[in-house]
Swiss-Prot record:
This is Bifunctional protein FolD. Belongs to the tetrahydrofolate dehydrogenase/cyclohydrolase family. NADP(+) binds at G165, R166, S167, S190. Gene3D superfamilies: Leucine Dehydrogenase, chain A, domain 1, NAD(P)-binding Rossmann-like Domain. One of its GO terms (cellular component) is cytosol. It catalyses: (6R)-5,10-methylene-5,6,7,8-tetrahydrofolate + NADP(+) = (6R)-5,10-methenyltetrahydrofolate + NADPH; (6R)-5,10-methenyltetrahydrofolate + H2O = (6R)-10-formyltetrahydrofolate + H(+). PANTHER family: C-1-TETRAHYDROFOLATE SYNTHASE, CYTOPLASMIC, C-1-TETRAHYDROFOLATE SYNTHASE, CYTOPLASMIC-RELATED. It holds the Pfam family THF_DHG_CYH_C. Catalyzes the oxidation of 5,10-methylenetetrahydrofolate to 5,10-methenyltetrahydrofolate and then the hydrolysis of 5,10-methenyltetrahydrofolate to 10-formyltetrahydrofolate. Keywords: Amino-acid biosynthesis, Histidine biosynthesis, Hydrolase, Methionine biosynthesis, Multifunctional enzyme, NADP, One-carbon metabolism, Oxidoreductase, Purine biosynthesis. GO terms for biological process: L-histidine biosynthetic process; methionine biosynthetic process; purine nucleotide biosynthetic process; tetrahydrofolate interconversion. Pathway: One-carbon metabolism; tetrahydrofolate interconversion. GO terms for molecular function: methenyltetrahydrofolate cyclohydrolase activity; methylenetetrahydrofolate dehydrogenase (NADP+) activity.
């Protein structure tokens, strides 16, 4: 029987544990983890993500500030704003909500964030730490998925893992984290030949390709663990993932739903990384 991986319930459990750790930290050291989110423009999806992050920070007992700036902000002004928060010890995590307007160089912005405050884990230094086997800041979505594997007792060692999608946000760091747990990893993408055939060999299938219901039953071998990172709208405007849930769920041993699967875990892990970043400031004193 297929087991549904309830990301919403797991995120709530971890958030409760994080709130306890944060309260203890505040009591013992007077330190309160602080996350600042910079939102450029008024993209509706970004507004939703930012509100969710605000709520999660509040639930975890952390401080949060959302800095909303107009879409017309220059790159220089945005970099100056980041520099201000880099230098402010009251803030332990800095997140610039993506995507950014076309006139702003995304790479330059990510490079400008202090790697010790880069709770998204997108700075090249943090990417390098991850790939060298010494991670400090890990992109939140892959980190959340690894926590799901742990909580649900899913053993990765020696398993065939296939990741569909090669982004720096999910696909590449996901592959490295699986590799670190001794899985045999195949990183695929939209141009992989015979993709369904490759995916059908997976014991662990992580899908992050950004196409509604892209993965159908012929991609999945019976008993596979299926993790759906996608967040799309179907032809009726209903939220759906990259996996055709109705077709795939009966085949899987474990599967994440959309919504209520990976999404809540992503935000919870972001708060955990903000807490860990705050702890590291104590080590540096």
């Amino acid at each position: 029987m297929t087991q549904i991986i309830d990301g919403k319930a797991l995120a709530a459990k971890l958030q409760g544990q994080l709130a306890e750790k944060t309260a203890k930290l505040k009591e013992e050291t007077a330190l309160v983890p602080g996350l600042v989110v910079i939102l450029v423009g008024d993209n509706p999806a970004s507004q939703v993500y930012v509100r969710n992050k605000e709520r999660s920070a509040l639930a975890a007992g952390s401080r949060s500030e959302v800095v909303r700036v107009p879409e017309t902000i220059t790159q220089e002004e945005l970099l100056d704003l980041i520099a201000k928060y880099n230098q402010d010890p009251a803030w332990h995590g800095i997140l610039v909500q993506l995507p950014l307007p076309k006139h702003i160089d995304e790479e330059a912005v990510l490079l400008a964030i202090d790697p010790e405050k880069d709770v998204d884990g997108f700075h090249p230094l943090n990417m390098g730490r991850l790939w060298s086997g010494h991670p400090v800041m890990i992109p939140s979505t892959p980190a959340g998925i690894m926590e799901m594997f742990h909580e649900y007792g899913i053993d990765l060692e020696g398993k065939n893992a296939v990741v569909i999608g090669r982004s720096n946000i999910v696909g590449k760091p996901m592959a490295q984290l699986l590799l670190a747990k001794n899985a045999t990893v195949t990183l695929t993408h939209s141009r992989t030949h015979n993709l369904a055939k490759v995916a059908a060999k997976a014991d662990i299938l992580v899908v992050a390709i950004g196409r509604a219901k892209f993965v159908t039953a012929d991609f999945v071998k019976p008993g596979a663990v299926v993790i759906d990172v996608g967040m799309n709208r179907d032809e009726n405007g209903k939220l759906c993932g990259d996996v055709d849930y109705e077709a795939v769920a009966p085949l899987a041993s474990h599967i994440t739903p959309v919504p209520g699967g990976v999404g809540p875990m992503t935000i919870t892990m972001l708060m955990e990384q903000t807490y860990q970043a705050a702890l590291r400031t104590l080590d540096r004193k």
